[in-house]
Amino acid sequence: MNTIKTRFGVIDYDPANLLLFPNGLVGLPHLRNFIVMPNKKEGPLFWIQSVDDPDMAFVLTDPNNFFPDYQIQPGKDEHTTLGISGSDEYFILSVVTVPADQKITLNLAAPIIFTPTNNRAVQVILGGDGYSTKTPLPTVKRHERRSVVNE
C-alpha cells in the first residue's frame, strides 16, 4: 500500500488498482495515474484523484444519466491505447464542472473512454460533433401536484 496526502485527507491506495491514462488528460499529459474515490453519497457523480499531482482531482459522471442519446464509439487509436478489442466492455465518462454559481456543466466535447478490463482510460477530443466543453445539465420540469378529494 502507498499513501498520498490530498484535499480529501491522507489516502491509502494499492498501486495495482490505479486507473491509468496512458496519454494523460487533455492539456495535462503528466497526469496519468488516478485513484477512483469511493462515493460517499448516493448519486451519479464520483471523484478521481491524481497520484501524480495530489492537488488535482476531477469529478466524473456517466453522461447518459443526463443525455441518454449521447453515444461515443472508440476508434482504432483508442482500442490500441486501451489495449482492448471490439468485444471488450467500455464506458463513457464526462468531466463535471461545478462553478461557484452551482450551474453544473459536463464536458461532452472531450469524453473519457474507460475499460474495466485493464483499468485504463483515454480522453478523446471529438471534432465537428457540436458538443461543448460546458454543456449545462438539462432542466427538469416540475409537475404540478394536484390533490384529489374524494367526495
From Swiss-Prot:
Alphabetical list of InterPro entries matching this protein: Flagellar_assembly_factor_FliW, Flagellar_assmbl_FliW_dom_sf
Supply the SUPFAM superfamilies for this chain. Answer: BH3618-like
Checking Pfam families in the record gives: FliW
**One of the GO biological process terms:** bacterial-type flagellum assembly
Instruction: Just give the chief location class.
Output: cytoplasm
Tell me which GO cellular component terms the UniProt record holds.
cytoplasm
What domain of life?
Bacteria
What is the annotated localization of this protein?
Cytoplasm
Keywords, A to Z, come to: Bacterial flagellum biogenesis, Chaperone, Cytoplasm, Translation regulation
> Subunit notes for this chain?
Interacts with translational regulator CsrA and flagellin(s).
Q: What does this protein do?
A: Acts as an anti-CsrA protein, binds CsrA and prevents it from repressing translation of its target genes, one of which is flagellin. Binds to flagellin and participates in the assembly of the flagellum.
Family named by the database record: Belongs to the FliW family.
Q: What name has this protein been given in UniProt? A: Flagellar assembly factor FliW 2
Say which species the protein is native to.
Answer: Desulfotalea psychrophila (strain LSv54 / DSM 12343)
